From Swiss-Prot:
Pathway stated in the Swiss-Prot or TrEMBL entry: Carbohydrate degradation; glycolysis; pyruvate from D-glyceraldehyde 3-phosphate: step 3/5
Top enzyme class: isomerase
UniProt entry keywords in alphabetical sequence: Glycolysis, Isomerase
Substrates-to-products reaction catalysed: (2R)-2-phosphoglycerate = (2R)-3-phosphoglycerate
GO biological process: glycolytic process
InterPro entries: Alkaline_phosphatase_core_sf, ApgAM_prokaryotes, Metalloenzyme, Pglycerate_mutase_ApgM
Native organism: Aquifex aeolicus (strain VF5)
Protein name: Probable 2,3-bisphosphoglycerate-independent phosphoglycerate mutase
Disulfide bonds: none
Taxonomic lineage of the native organism: Bacteria, Pseudomonadati, Aquificota, Aquificia, Aquificales
Protein family (similarity comment): Belongs to the BPG-independent phosphoglycerate mutase family. A-PGAM subfamily.
CDD domains: iPGM_like (cd16011)
A Pfam family annotated for this UniProt entry: PhosphMutase
SUPFAM superfamilies xref list: Alkaline phosphatase-like
Length: 407
């Protein structure tokens, strides 16, 4: 057990962590970042009585994926606990992943056959509607239920995405997921053949190759989604739950499968709800407020607009969140943290290595250091620049959930 686990105590306090995905940015207009351009009167008021700083999701100069970015926020070292995308996607779609499983994320894609070989012309099949995805996936699942004694579980995600789990009869050895992606990462190329990097992985890859062959036959006459590209083969990692480590009863309120999956992996209850807006998330939060003591709320669109290079869209999401902030505050959490899992500057159109703004509000902070919740103002804050993995213990401390260390 680590030191924090030994110091944890329960006291009924409530911790609310709100993650605006890809929150951090760089100057995009008039020398200002998206946070600086946004009109955020409610955040501006809150920040004056909060501890502020920035966090490094993984390590200096390292650009994190969403998985490592969130793991750090939850208090898990993302270098120690490495979780594959396939596992996250499968968990997020409600598949109860076991230690006999290899999970992989799939993209429906469009290929053209040239000289008998499939050539990728659209890696996302024109982002087919989710309903179309459900139809195609149901057809696939009906036709492919097992391969050589290995159960095949296929679940549709949003738009072109899906998850596939290969469930073997026995527990798999570590490293059985060491299989290359089949996505060539660009159009005009032939999909890659999945191959194992060791004998155990090659046994799995043999099943995967047969799956691709059968799926391709079934999809051949689909107008757009006539192929599947596979990414992120992964096994279930051995990871302690948040309740075991931190003594909290946690839940997750998120729209996108991967974030639900990650939360599930660390033992959070995933709260299902209709809709996808911030208001829908708040309504759900209110319903379960008395049932849990740690709440993770995920807001995706800041990241989506950042990746599109649409700084105005990102600004609008920040402003929309600010307009809803009073409803979060009405719940009176003992500790409120607002941050991102990583930075997604619009000018880079992708994740980046830059530190992420962090706000912690509780009765036990110095406060009075920042005028606004922005990158530059957070640099002035009492928290400084800290590793993301330390945030959870700060939240526990502010919730008075940690005993004194030593005599």
């Amino acid at each position: 057990m680590d030191v924090i686990s030994e110091l944890v105590k329960k006291n009924g306090s409530k911790i609310l962590l709100i993650v605006l995905d890809g929150l951090g940015g760089l100057p995009v207009k008039e020398g200002k970042t998206e946070l600086e351009l946004a009109k955020t009167p409610n955040l501006d008021k809150l920040v004056k009585n909060s501890a502020t700083g920035l966090h490094i999701p993984v390590d200096w100069g390292i650009t994190p994926g969403s998985g490592p970015g969130h793991l750090g926020l939850f208090g898990y070292d993302p270098i120690k606990y490495q979780i594959g995308r396939g596992i996250l996607e499968a968990l997020g779609l409600g598949i109860d992943v076991k230690d006999t499983d290899i999970a992989v994320r799939g993209n429906y894609a469009t290929v053209e056959y040239r000289n008998g070989k499939p050539i990728v012309v659209d890696r996302r099949a024109g982002r087919i509607p989710t309903e179309e995805n459900k139809r195609i996936t149901a057809k696939l699942q009906e036709a492919i239920k097992e391969i050589d004694g290995v159960q095949v579980i296929i679940k549709p995600g949003m738009e072109h995405r899906l998850a596939i789990v290969f469930r073997f009869p026995e527990k798999l050895s570590p490293g059985s997921d060491a299989i290359n992606d089949t996505d060539p990462q660009q159009v005009g190329k032939e999909p890659l053949e999945p191959k194992g990097e060791n004998p155990n992985a090659e046994k799995v890859a043999e099943v995967v190759r047969k799956f691709i062959q059968r799926a391709t036959e079934i999809l051949r006459n689909e107008p757009k989604a006539n192929y599947i590209l596979l990414r992120g083969f992964s096994q279930k990692p051995d990871i302690p739950t948040m309740e075991e480590r931190f003594g909290v009863k946690p839940c997750c309120i998120a729209v996108y499968p991967m974030y639900k999956g990650l939360a599930s992996l660390v033992g959070m209850d995933v709260i299902e709800f209709e809709g996808s807006t911030i208001q829908d998330e708040i309504d759900t939060l209110k319903k379960v407020w008395n049932e849990y003591d740690y709440f993770f709320v995920h807001i995706k669109k800041t990241d989506s607009y950042g990746e599109d290079g649409n700084y105005e869209g990102k600004v609008s999401v920040i402003e929309d969140f600010d307009a809803h902030l009073p409803q979060f505050l009405e719940l009176k959490p003992d500790v409120l943290a607002i941050t991102g899992d990583h930075s997604t500057p619009s000018i880079l159109k992708g994740h980046s290595w830059h530190p992420v703004p962090l706000l912690i509000h509780s009765p036990y902070v110095l406060g009075g250091t920042s005028e606004r919740f922005t990158e530059r103002e957070c640099l002035k804050g009492e928290l400084g620049i800290i590793p993301a993995v330390k945030i959870t213990q700060l939240l526990l401390a502010n919730a008075l959930r940690l005993k004194k260390y030593g005599a």
